Amino acid sequence: MKLLLKNINELAAKQKSEGLTAFEKERQAALRQEYLKKIRGTVQDNLHHVTIIDPLGDDVTPKKLKEIQAELRG
């Protein structure tokens, strides 16, 4: 992920300073899509492991999320 961000930032800096070639623009778009895919996957994975508790201490995790969690447990 660090290398991915490094490449994205290098292309962004180059775009600001001198512009990008068509190939570099395509590469930049592909890198950004890959980055977003990884971030979304991480967020989704984190949400699949969340339990929601109300102020009274009751589990109020949505049914759909509980079903996903049950599938992940096997």
UniProtKB/Swiss-Prot annotation:
The keyword Secreted does not apply. Pfam families: DUF896. One of its GO terms (cellular component) is cytoplasm. InterPro entries: DUF896. Keywords: Cytoplasm. It is found in: Cytoplasm. Belongs to the UPF0291 family. HAMAP family: UPF0291. This is UPF0291 protein lmo0496.
